[in-house]
Amino acid sequence: MACELRAVLLWGRGLQTVLRAPALAGVRRGKPVLHLQKTTVQFRGPTQSLASGISAGQLYSTQAAEDKEEESLHSIISNTEAVRGSVSKHEFQAETKKLLDIVARSLYSEKEVFIRELISNASDALEKLRHKLVCEGQVLPEMEIHLQTDAKKGTITIQDTGIGMTQEELVSNLGTIARSGSKAFLEALQNQAETSSKIIGQFGVGFYSAFMVADKVEVYSRSAAPESPGYQWLSDGSGVFEIAEASGVRPGTKIIIHLKSDCKDFASESRVQDVVTKYSNFVSFPLYLNGKRINTLQAIWMMDPKDISEFQHEEFYRYIAQAYDKPRFTLHYKTDAPLNIRSIFYVPEMKPSMFDVSRELGSSVALYSRKVLIQTKAADILPKWLRFIRGVVDSEDIPLNLSRELLQESALIRKLRDVLQQRLIKFFIDQSKKDAEKYAKFFEDYGLFMREGIVTTAEQDIKEDIAKLLRYESSALPAGQLTSLPDYASRMQAGTRNIYYLCAPNRHLAEHSPYYEAMKQKHTEVLFCYEQFDELTLLHLREFDKKKLISVETDIVVDHYKEEKFEDTSPADERLSEKETEDLMAWMRNALGSRVTNVKVTFRLDTHPAMVTVLEMGAARHFLRMQQLAKTQEERAQLLQPTLEINPRHTLIKKLCQLRESEPELAQLLVDQIYENAMIAAGLVDDPRAMVGRLNDLLVKVLEKH
C-alpha cells in the first residue's frame, strides 16, 4: 500500500516511478521485515531521469526504522606520504620566533581561532589555483577542504586541493612573517602586557596559530605546477623547522597538528564542527569534516534579495566580517547598468573603535568576478572614507587576470567605485528618511568617516553628495533634534544665499556665544556644530547647493555686513557718549598694545561686553590648533590680527571708562580680562590657566572695597 501511495504522489508531481516488488528479508523481533528493491524515478521525458535515494537493502518495517542509511562519506585524507632523501634544518626568522612565543602562551579562549585561520589559508590556496586555471582556460579539478579528527592519536588534520607550495615557498611562507596581518598583530601587542583574544581574532596569525594548540606540526605540500615534487615541513615551534622531499603527496597542502595535552578537545568532531559553523560556514569551497560535508556553500550575493532571510544575512555578515554582532544596515545591490554588479554591503552594529577609524586600515570588501575571488580586501573598490563597510562585490565586467597594480589604476575600477559610492550614499539618505532615530545613532557612531570623506574628496559634487549625510542641531529647532543641509536649505527665505553655522562644544555655549548673539538680530537660522572636526569639514565643503557655508564669526567681518544696519535705540544715559567711547577705545588700544590690531564699537551685542573678530576665524583657529604655533598672546595676535569690538551699553565697559582715570591699575587688570574672555569665547585660547593669577588679583581689588 505504501509503495502504491508513493507512486501516486510521484505521478502527481509530474513524475513516474518504476517499482519492483519488495522481497522478504526475514524476521526481526518476531515481525516481518521487507527490503525494497532498487527503485528508479523518471521525469516524463525521453532524456531526463533521476535516481532516487532509496537503495537496495533499505529497511521497510511496521515499526520505526532503527537503522538509518549510512550517509555517504567523502574524504581525501590518507596516510600515503613518506619522507625520502635528506632532511634540511632551518631557523625561524626573529619576528617569527617572537610570534610563535606569543601564540604558545595564548589564553584557552583564543585557541579555537586556529581552525578558522587554517581554513582561511586553505581557501586562499584554492582561490589562487582557481584564478590561475580560469585565466589559463584549463579545466578545474575537485576543489575541496577536508578536516579529520583522531581522538586516539590526538590529532586534527586539514587538507586542501589548492595551489600547494614548492620547497622555496615552504621556507618563505612558513619560516618568515609575510602576512601584513601578522606584522600588525606584533605591532599591536608592543604596548600590551598580555595577549588579547580581540587582537588575535582581529588580525589573525595565519599558519602560526596552529602552535597555540600543537606540540608538533607536520605539513605535506606539493605545488600544482606540473611534475612538482612533494615536501614535508616539520616543527615543534621551538625555533627551527625541517624540510625534506616526500613521496605520496597529492597536489595541495596537508597539515597534521599533534595536539597538546590540554587541547585534546580539538580532536573531537563536535568541537571542530562548532568552530567551523561559528567562523567558516560560508567558505567558498566544499568543506568536509571526517568525510561529511558541513559548510553552507552559497554565493548569496548572486541570489534574489527576496530569497535571502535576515538570519542568512546575519550569518554571512559574521563570516565575512569575522564579527559577532549583527549588521546595523544591509544593502543588497544588483544592477546591469552602467556595469554588471552583484553586491551585498553591511554596516556593523558595534561602534567603531579608534583602531577601526585609523586610515591605515584598508577596505573590508571582497572583490569577485563571476564568483572567482580577485581580492579578499579590495582597497580601491570603495573610497577610503567608506572603509567601515563590510561586504562583497561581484562584477562580470572585471577581467579575471586583473593584477593588483592594474586594479589601482583601472578606469573600470574607478567607474565601479563611483557607482558604488553613489549607491551607498543614496542608501544612507533613504535610511535617514525611513528611520530618522536609527540613522541619528548611526551618524553619531560613524559620522567621523563622512566628515573625512568631505575633507579628502577633491570633486565638489561628491563633497556635496556626502554632505547630505551630515546632521546638526539648529537654532530653529528644539535641543536634540537634528537637521540636514537639504532641510536647512528648504527653510531658507527666498533670496537668501548663505548657510550659517557656529562651532561650539555644546548647545549651551553656542546659544550664549557673543557671535550667535550678534546673529539673533538678523533672525537667521544657525547650525550648531559640536564635534571637533565639524569646522574643518565645513571649511572644506565651502558651499552646498550653490549656497555658501559661512561661520557666524566670519559673517561679522565680511564687507556686506555693514555696521550701520544696527541702530542703537537704547536711551543715551544707558550707554557711553560718542566722545567717551572714542577716548576709551584709544586708551584700550594703548593698554592692549600688540595684542590687538584695532578696537571698535559694535551694537550687535547685548549681554556680552566685547568680542574678538578675525578674518576667516575658523581657518585661523584650525591652523593654530594643527601647527601648535604662537604660544604667547603676542605671537597669536601677530598671526590672527584680531579686532576687539566693545559694547558701549554694557556695565563692564561703562565702568572701565571711569576706572581708567580713577584707578588705572584696576582698569588695566579689567581690560586684560575682558580681552582674554573674548579670546576664550572665540576658541583662540588653548589653556586658560594663565589668567588665574589675574582673576585672583581682581578678586583682591574687589574685596578691598568691602
Swiss-Prot record:
Location in the cell: Mitochondrion; Mitochondrion inner membrane; Mitochondrion matrix
Signal peptide start and end residues: none
InterPro entries according to UniProt: HATPase_C_sf, HSP90_C, Hsp90_fam, Hsp90_N, Ribosomal_Su5_D2-typ_SF
GO MF entries: ATP binding; ATP hydrolysis activity; ATP-dependent protein folding chaperone; protein kinase binding; RNA binding; unfolded protein binding
Presequence range in chain numbering: 1-60
Modified residue annotations for Phosphoserine: 172, 196, 570
Entry superkingdom: Eukaryota
Cellular component GO terms held in the UniProt record: mitochondrial inner membrane; mitochondrial intermembrane space; mitochondrial matrix; mitochondrion; nucleoplasm
Signal is among the record's keywords: no
Binding positions for ATP per the UniProt entry: 121, 160, 173, 207, 404
Residues recorded as bearing N6-acetyllysine in the entry: 264, 326, 334, 426, 433, 468
SUPFAM superfamilies: ATPase domain of HSP90 chaperone/DNA topoisomerase II/histidine kinase, HSP90 C-terminal domain, Ribosomal protein S5 domain 2-like
Phosphothreonine carried by residues: 176, 496
First-listed, main subcellular location of the protein, grouped into a coarse class: mitochondrion
Keyword field contains Acetylation: yes
A single BP term in Gene Ontology: negative regulation of cellular respiration
Keywords linked to the UniProt accession: Acetylation, ATP-binding, Chaperone, Membrane, Mitochondrion, Mitochondrion inner membrane, Nucleotide-binding, Phosphoprotein, Transit peptide
Described purpose of this protein according to its UniProt entry: Chaperone that expresses an ATPase activity. Involved in maintaining mitochondrial function and polarization, downstream of PINK1 and mitochondrial complex I. Is a negative regulator of mitochondrial respiration able to modulate the balance between oxidative phosphorylation and aerobic glycolysis. The impact of TRAP1 on mitochondrial respiration is probably mediated by modulation of mitochondrial SRC and inhibition of SDHA.
Protein family membership: Belongs to the heat shock protein 90 family.
Subunit annotation: Binds to the intracellular domain of tumor necrosis factor type 1 receptor. Binds to RB1. Interacts with SRC. Interacts with SDHA.
Protein name (record): Heat shock protein 75 kDa, mitochondrial
GN (gene name): Trap1
